[in-house]
Structure formats: C-alpha cells, structure tokens
Amino acid sequence: MFGQQQQQQPPPPAASAYLNHNSRWTPPNESAQPRRSSNAMDINAITDRDPAEGHPRSNHTSSSIGSPIDKSPETYPGHEENGRIYHGFRRGIYFLPCDDLEQDRLDIFHKVITVARVSDALIYSPHPRNGRFLDLGCGTGIWAIDVAQKYPDAFVVGVDLSPIQPLNSPRNCDFYAPFDFESPWALGEDSWDLIHMQLGCGSVVSWPSLYRRIFAHLRPGAWFEQVEIDFEPRCDDRSLEGLALHHWYQCLKQATEEAMRPLAHNPRETIRHLQEAGFTEIDHQIVGLPLNPWHQDEHEKTVARWYNLAICESIETFSLAPFTRFFGWPVDRIKRLVADVRSEAFNKDIHAYNILHIYQARKPISN
C-alpha cells in the first residue's frame, strides 16, 4: 500500500518519488443553494449540492479586514475567453476561470486532497478550537466552510480574486472578495492562529514575498499550512517522453513561466523560502496521486478515481488561457491535445502519477 512519508527534506528525484505508503460575468444568484460539505461528496454519484441551513453574518469581523464579498457584476465584470468566464478584478493575472465548471472542479480537488490524506482532519497543525483561521485563495470557500462548521467557536476568513463564495455561509465564516493576496493586506499582523493555502501554484509571482507576509500575520507560535500538487507526470516503470501527457505538461510549464506565475512546484525552493521567511519546525509530506485506478491497493484505487475525475476536468481548463495567450494556439489545436492527454490519463497501462505536497511551518514564539 502506498503511504505518507514525513520528512524534513524535499523528496528525491522523480524516478523514486512515488512512495509506498489538484461575454460578461453574471454573478451567482444570491438565493442560490450553498455548496455542500466535501464529506458528502460521492465519487459514484456526483450530484448538485444539497441546501444547507443559512446563518446570520458573523460579528467577529475586524474593521481592518476590508470589504466583504461583492457579487455586483458592475464592480469588476468578468470576461469571456475561449468559451469560459474569467475574473474581472486584476484582469488577466490568473490563468484559471471562475465559472460554474471551475467551481465544481475546485471542489473535486478539495475532495481529492481529503481522500488522499486518509483523514477527515481539515487542520493538521496544533490550533485552538476557537482560533482565527485565514484561507488564502479560498476559491468556492469549501475548506473555510468545512472548518467553520467543525469549529463553531472559531472565526474563519477566506479571501479570493473572484467572489464565487456562497452568501449564506456559517455565521462564523466570512469571505472577502475580490481580494488580491499579492497586494498589501489589511488583515491584522500577529493576529491569526493558522493561515491555510491550497493549490496556490500558478497564482503567485514571488513566493518569498508571500511567505514573509504570511509570517508577519501569524501570531507567535502559530502555523502555516500549504497544500500543492506537482502536476509533472511521473512513471516508475517506463518513460513518458513522446506521450501527450509529457508534451502537455512541458508546454504548460513553459507558458505559466512566461506568465510569471509558474504552475510548476519545487519543494526544495519551497522549504528554502519558508526558512528564509523565518519559519521553523517545517514538516513536509508527500503522497502519490495515481492518474487512474491502476494500483492494486483499494485505497489507492479510490484516490485514483477521484484524481482521474479531477485531472480530466483540469486538462482543458489549465490549457486554454496559457496556450492561447502565450503561444497563440487556436482552440481547435488545444482541444486535440487535450483529447490525447485525457486518453492517456484513462489508460491503465500507463502507470502515471502526480505528487501531493503538504507543508506545515511554524512562526517561532520569539523571533
């Protein structure tokens, strides 16, 4: 059975990395049903989210945080590009869309991460049950909502470029969007018990700068948790060169590097940047994510079914903006490549996988 590996150093090279052990914008309807907790998602029957009970807004909010979620299309109208809707605020800096398809994709990746970690824990670092938790790039808000429901005495804030979060979230959960976490914050330094970030690669120009800002906003002794996926396809029993999977990733890596927000993840650099920002007690775990259910272990097969759904929903989404903006490719060419990559992702004779990286880093009690 594949298992998790805890380590202080980055993982070994790719060959041995898989250890035995994700027009104008019309805003969502304010009366729309909220997204259901990830625990309720079923890989055998993905259905519309059930409505959940709404709550009055929290009164925990600090006046220093800023304006709450703004779903007015006149404020920062989204724009259509290649048939998808992209954010209007800071237009063009982020390569992923913000429409309904993207929101479902983000929730599926949240489920992938939960299943892969073999635990229903949402926070792995030490934390007070009544703490202040900040989620950077919260997307649909699914992690923040799950945390708020699990810890009703906590105060949870999610921030994101796009106002795609539900308005009737739990009373102890607030969202602030549009919000660019690469711009100066007004979130209160030395005031957060945990800061969380999930799948941030592809949205950050300067990780050292972001880590310094995160460090400044944590209370002494508090923790930062980051979850990333290295989307470079790997295979331990054959070369992937010459396959569409390999070609697609290399093109995606190049395009996002040209955009100054690389999707590629480098664990050695991540640990070094965290250390340079002042973090200590840095823990790094890696988990293999099979692209399809080729593995014999039943748990790995379950992870693979979820991840196959997630990655097949992501290939075209990842490709459209980078390949049209930076390579000038026509959409038809992109769709042909996407079809080839999906076919290989479904092929159980290709034992390909990606790597999930999980980091925990602590701000020292005394600097």
Curated annotation (Swiss-Prot):
Pfam family, one: Methyltransf_23
Family matches, as CDD domains: AdoMet_MTases
A GO term from the CC aspect: nucleus
Biased composition (Polar residues): 19-41
Phenotype seen when the gene is deleted: Decreases synthesis of monacolin K.
GO biological process: methylation; sporulation resulting in formation of a cellular spore
Enzyme superclass (EC): transferase
Family recorded in the similarity comment: Belongs to the methyltransferase superfamily. LaeA methyltransferase family.
Protein name: Secondary metabolism regulator laeA
Species this chain originates from: Monascus pilosus
Gene: laeA
